[in-house]
């Protein structure tokens, strides 16, 4: 019985620590869009500025497809 109570208290304590840590780090990541664009360009083959592109198959390294060309 005592061991069960100790395990329950330990799990609750660890869960509380996880939630506090997650709440503390919210909003501290800077340059989120820059990081995601860099990740995208590293993980997929993308087209350079001025190359033809499709808005359906989004594949520009610059992050925008305007008038059928990467910009």
From Swiss-Prot:
Residues 23-45 form a propeptide. Keywords: Amidation, Calcium channel impairing toxin, Disulfide bond, Ion channel impairing toxin, Knottin, Neurotoxin, Presynaptic neurotoxin, Secreted, Signal, Toxin, Voltage-gated calcium channel impairing toxin. SUPFAM superfamilies: omega toxin-like. PROSITE patterns: OMEGA_CONOTOXIN. The record marks 58 as: Important for calcium channel binding. Disulfide bonds join 46-61, 53-65, 60-70. InterPro entries: Conotoxin, Conotoxin_omega-typ_CS. Negative results: has no effect on R-type calcium currents, voltage-gated sodium currents, delayed rectifier potassium currents and transient outward potassium currents. The presence of a 'disulfide through disulfide knot' structurally defines this protein as a knottin. Omega-conotoxins act at presynaptic membranes, they bind and block voltage-gated calcium channels (Cav). This peptide selectively targets Cav2.2/CACNA1B (IC(50)=160 nM) voltage-gated calcium channels. When tested in mammals, this toxin displays an analgesic potency similar to MVIIA in a range of acute and chronic pain models in rodents, but has less adverse effects (tremor, diminution of spontaneous locomotor activity and bad coordinated locomotion) compared with identical dosages of MVIIA injected intrathecally. This is Omega-conotoxin SO-3. It comes from Conus striatus.
């Amino acid at each position: 019985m005592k061991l069960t109570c100790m395990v329950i208290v330990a799990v609750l304590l660890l869960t509380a620590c996880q939630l506090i840590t997650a709440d503390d780090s919210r909003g501290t990541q800077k340059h989120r869009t820059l990081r995601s664009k860099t990740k995208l360009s590293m993980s997929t083959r993308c087209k350079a500025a001025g190359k033809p592109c499709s808005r359906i198959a989004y594949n520009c390294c610059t992050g925008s497809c305007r008038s059928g060309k990467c910009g």
